[in-house]
């Protein structure tokens, strides 16, 4: 391919919902058509969704009736205010069933906002054992596997960090070609600029056995920039400050635990949904948008006696938490302090599996879909016996507070 780095304030025309900023190398010269899209350096909204990954009738139905309409609605809410909106799908658009690429392109087009794609391990042809060649079907429908574009004041870099071996086997990492390309591209990006780096597998994950190949080389290239990495692959949520200038949003799957039955949570307890980033004159703000909920749905509490292992404590789940957030509680109007963080199993997803086993005879034996036992975004406190009313106040990284109260 030959492609253009789409400048801020413009968008390439879409085919099947995805921007066509590229052309095949079969002519001596190429002309690229771009349309105005907002204002140069102006406001915009971006939605980052990970692991749509449908396989089977139920998964496609839920993706097309729950997830895509939600994305469309949020996108249209921004565009009704003359704020351009687009989305990024962070890989595993399908689940090895690549014959469904034409179908999912048709459904993506119905969202009616531009969708930039990222290639994931399940988007490779499992019958091909060569990394580059195994992406042939993806390229046919979506274009280059790595590229760049601009939006607002931000610079976007999209990477392919799946080293595919064939037959569903792969490693996660970067090759020489892409590292050299990133290094060359950054010569045109001023130091101090803000970058979004989008790739399927995360740069970091709290599972100590995980390692992205050549990740240090990649991160070293971003010295002098402000960087937010957007990734998926794990199907759970993990927001991490990797370096002083680099933060990663490893985003839980929009389908939760692989669209399991009628489930509405990932196996770590994150509701099915996606991240929304708003870019404007004051920089970047973000929130997690749960499907079927408004933007203020950012935490959930569990009364005393409802969480195994914490029976005498009030517990709170804050799925989009990072180290800039605060989780505080009040007793009868008096601030008591911050709640303590703990790692544990999500009571919602765990009870969902229990309920399905008891009432419908469904026994989840697949190890990969069992509840995550070390999700880190839970908080607890032991209220005083005399407290009558408890208020929980969660403050996000942007300084916005969310409140819920309960009788004790």
Where are these regions (language model features)?
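Edge beta-strands of extracellular beta-sandwich domains
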Residues: 12-21, 289, 400-408
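Short acidic, glycine-rich surface-loop motifs adjacent to enzyme active sites
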Residues: 186-207
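Conserved structural position at the C-terminal beta-strand
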Residues: 4-6, 394
């Amino acid at each position: 391919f030959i492609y253009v780095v789409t400048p801020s304030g413009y968008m390439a025309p879409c085919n099947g919902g995805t921007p066509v900023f590229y052309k095949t190398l079969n002519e001596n010269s190429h002309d690229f058509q771009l349309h105005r899209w907002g204002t140069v350096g102006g406001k915009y909204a971006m939605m980052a969704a990970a692991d749509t990954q449908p396989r089977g009738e139920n998964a496609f139905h839920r993706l097309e009736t729950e997830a895509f309409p939600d994305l469309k609605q949020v996108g249209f809410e921004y565009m009704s205010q003359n704020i351009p909106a687009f989305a990024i799908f962070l890989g595993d658009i399908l689940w090895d069933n690549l014959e469904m690429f034409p179908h999912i392109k048709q459904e993506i087009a119905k969202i009616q906002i531009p969708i930039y794609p990222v290639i994931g391990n399940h988007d490779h042809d499992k019958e091909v054992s060569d990394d580059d060649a195994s992406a042939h079907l993806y390229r046919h429908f979506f274009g280059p596997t790595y590229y760049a574009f601009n939006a607002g004041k931000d610079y976007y870099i999209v990477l392919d960090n799946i080293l595919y071996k064939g037959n569903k086997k792969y490693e996660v990492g970067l090759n020489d070609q892409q590292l050299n390309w990133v290094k060359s591209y950054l010569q045109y990006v001023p130091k101090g600029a803000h970058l979004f780096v989008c790739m399927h597998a995360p740069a970091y994950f709290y599972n100590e056995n995980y390692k992205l190949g050549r990740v240090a080389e990649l991160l070293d290239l971003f010295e002098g920039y402000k960087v937010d990495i957007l990734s998926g692959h794990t199907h759970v949520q993990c927001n991490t400050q990797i370096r002083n200038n680099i933060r990663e949003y490893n985003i839980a799957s929009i389908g939760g635990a692989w669209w399991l039955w009628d489930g509405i949570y990932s196996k770590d307890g994150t509701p099915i949904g996606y991240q929304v980033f708003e870019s404007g004159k004051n920089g970047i703000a973000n929130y997690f948008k749960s499907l079927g909920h408004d933007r203020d749905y950012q935490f959930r509490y569990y009364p005393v006696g409802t969480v195994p292992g914490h029976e005498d404590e009030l517990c709170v789940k804050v799925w989009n938490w990072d180290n800039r957030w605060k989780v505080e509680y009040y007793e009868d109007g008096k601030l008591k302090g911050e709640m303590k963080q703990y790692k544990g199993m999500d009571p919602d997803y765990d009870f969902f599996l229990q309920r399905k086993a008891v009432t419908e005879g469904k026994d989840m034996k697949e190890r990969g879909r069992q509840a995550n036992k070390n999700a880190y975004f839970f908080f607890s406190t032991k209220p005083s016996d005399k407290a009558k009313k408890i208020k929980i106040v969660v403050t996000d990284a942007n300084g916005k507070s969310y409140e819920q109260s309960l009788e004790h």
